[in-house]
Amino acid sequence: MLLFLEMEPEYVKQAFRDLFNEEKSVDGRMDRFVFYCDELLRMYRERHPHSIENNHYHGNDYDMISLYLTFRYPADYAPYSLERLISLLRKLGVGNLPQANDPVRYFKVMRTLFKLMQKEDGIQARHQERLTGSSYYQGESLLLAHDFACFITDDRYAERGLCRPYPGK
């Protein structure tokens, strides 16, 4: 993305402005962002045909796009993974599993989990315990629901550092 920003700063800014426009549907914004990135990669390849960076972009990677949304709107979005969504829905006993990427459904599930978790007194306090110091975002964030989803779906997420363990664990 930094190479794209260096190459076409206004185009990249427009891509992010569109992605962060909450007046439009999130699935449409994410799909348009994929289109913007495809175009940027096409331009980059034309200008730098022998660059190793030509193979770095991973197509319609909603995972990375969701991370941009999470950083911009932490109370509304969480890092997306189709694998995590399917595993989470299985663990929750949901029968209608997605057959393809469905970040909109994932965000809805995260918001629902977060609301349920907020009703449990000890969970929020325990979460705040691990966010010591000024380097951690202190506002409302779906990352609590994301951590829960990681915890109940796959221990590999914690091992790779994508889910931060609670103190004393």
Ranges and model annotations:
Residues 1-58, 74-169:
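An N-terminal alpha-helical hairpin/helix-loop-helix interaction module that forms a charged
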